């Protein structure tokens, strides 16, 4: 305690001594009426994350001499005149003189001893002006508070000072506003980027309080959230070193105030704030057009390449150029390249500009004369656009206006896709709750709930995810007469952010699951359970779920679902696992084989698809079985980044009324003694379809058949026995771009674009004679991530370009035998995967007499062995029975 008090006393004495210097009138870092000579050095180093890299390979150093004259002073105010001379830049031992910096001085005004404005010539380039702001910011040293905010070249920053001695001070900067200037970003953390920044400034003063040395050291780490070892590390130092006192006489401006002194300069100069502006030249795209890049990529953009990483990589390379392309140019490309139209409309959806939107609709939509092929392409465009994270508001307004036109009402599928896209884009736009557009879209969708097709609007509300619609969805979930309405409403509610629900909502979900007021479809009950569990159940609620397992409810498939869901959560969360075990031990009537050995075929599981050094991806599979037949199933691919996760793709299958075709699941030789669940509806229509969600955007569902007549047509005609594409598209995944201003004034530009190309196809074989069926679903995915970083100023630049390509594939085979009892065997397989990573770091000396460039390349690859995923013991037993004679 005594040592601590001594340390505090020492700090206070140092601070008092330092403040004493300030009070004695020796506050100026540059002595009034004097000339001081300094040397300025700025070094910027770019390193690749994940491996050792020599700083000398990708770095530059800028050096110059500064002559600082104090040309006006009064009280604590001062005007400094700064001349830059003898400038040079060096990279990899190659030094180049800079002769283009004008010999005109710039000025720094100081108010109460602190830099306030930069007065510079209007013709100077942006990066040089930023450098001048950086020089001025190094003179910002204040000790009137231990922690506060300061405005300097990096914007508004939180700062704190640490007085080391009477002549040495350390300043720490945090959370500067210009360290994260976002242009585009993905709201899903797992699909975003992570940035860490810090800066420390060291000051050394003379015994009189004048500046001898100022040194800024800042670090910026930029990486993919889902793959932290991929990205860049930028280090920058800015050093101002006092050399000597100048010998020239400093002519003073004989004016009565600082404002008048500044005013006298404004014939040729302008006044600028300390806060920097982005130097747009750092992100300027080379002289290349979208048409040139498209022609160079045509071989990778063919329909046969869908599902391959080569197409995804070509796709993301086109995005930056496409975002600066005009409508007329898009129209020409659509006309000239008809052979790759499907890929072009995917691209234009990802562009998210009004020019791309107008070109697409102008080319494809002909109102009543629109052909079926054009309608398909328009739907494809809308599906790509629906994944957009920063759509132009005018696009949303145009699509919403289309819904009122009579011509589009005749194209039912297109109209539904427009509704789903409008809902998704409205959510992605992040509109204020009082925004008129949000209110109009919400009102339109809520009115649709009373139409003849309420499920369409319920799906749209799922995409909108507006908390103001929760009550309406809950009402449909609890009072809807048709089972599919309750299921759709709960499926929509499950998509909402967890923070949208309150305790009243939780009670209503419990009421649905436990059927306290009425009976509900089994899918509605399992969806309600999912929401309750995602809201983190209390100890009492968990105990109630365990007690339910031993209840007399005869819906054994739901009990199986509950048990598997609880076990899955226990595997993932240590806290929940401890709670689960403690509650289970308390219940002897539950903790026995009779209850825990549930009889159902329903399966809930999660499996690791890949992990570091590849991406951390898991598969979440839910197969809800009814009378031995798959009633509702889903396979969802989740990308993880720390504690956050994002759904990259979700495939759902739903069926109804198929039990009559396969007979009684309990008849037979007794191999499959599964008691039938309670009947919910005896006259259920025979239907089946597919639901697809891409990065949380629910697409228009695909209906396989509706009615027994249509089903039997497929059975006898064998129309589903050949592999048929169900979904083929390339969509944007990562879409992040932002700028950082370094203390030296150099601009850093970072852009990360990612795409996923998906080819989903399947086939079904059905034999009433042999009483069996076979289903095969194949998903081929090609993903690519392209990163670009550039940092520098007019005369030097560092660049890093990296790419990651990956082709994860998955196949699901299901064999159903209902010749004697019902036996269902599912096999989930993943073939070998290869992840490739390339990286190129470059240094450029430019706008000098002899330009210089150097490139450093590296590659990395990682193989993941193929495997067949274990599902559960019941599935293993079924597979052994079906294939015992093979």
Swiss-Prot record:
It comes from the Eukaryota. Its main location: endoplasmic reticulum. Residues 1-27 form the signal peptide. InterPro entries: Lipid_transp_b-sht_shell (IPR015819), Lipovitellin_superhlx_dom (IPR011030), MTP_lip-bd (IPR045811), MTTP (IPR039988), Vitellinogen_b-sht_N (IPR015816), Vitellogenin_N (IPR001747). Glycans are attached at residues 358, 484, 502, 616. Keywords: Endoplasmic reticulum, Glycoprotein, Golgi apparatus, Signal, Transport. One of its GO terms (cellular component) is endoplasmic reticulum. GO terms for biological process: dendrite morphogenesis; lipoprotein metabolic process; lumen formation, open tracheal system; synaptic target recognition. It is found in: Endoplasmic reticulum; Golgi apparatus. Residues 30-653 form the Vitellogenin domain. It catalyses: a 1,2-diacyl-sn-glycero-3-phosphocholine(in) = a 1,2-diacyl-sn-glycero-3-phosphocholine(out); a 1,2-diacyl-sn-glycero-3-phosphoethanolamine(in) = a 1,2-diacyl-sn-glycero-3-phosphoethanolamine(out). Catalyzes the transport of phospholipids such as phosphatidylethanolamine (1,2-diacyl-sn-glycero-3-phosphoethanolamine) and phosphatidylcholine (1,2-diacyl-sn-glycero-3-phosphocholine) between membranes. Required for the assembly and secretion of plasma lipoproteins that contain apolipoprotein B. This is Microsomal triacylglycerol transfer protein. It comes from Drosophila melanogaster (Fruit fly). The gene is Mtp.
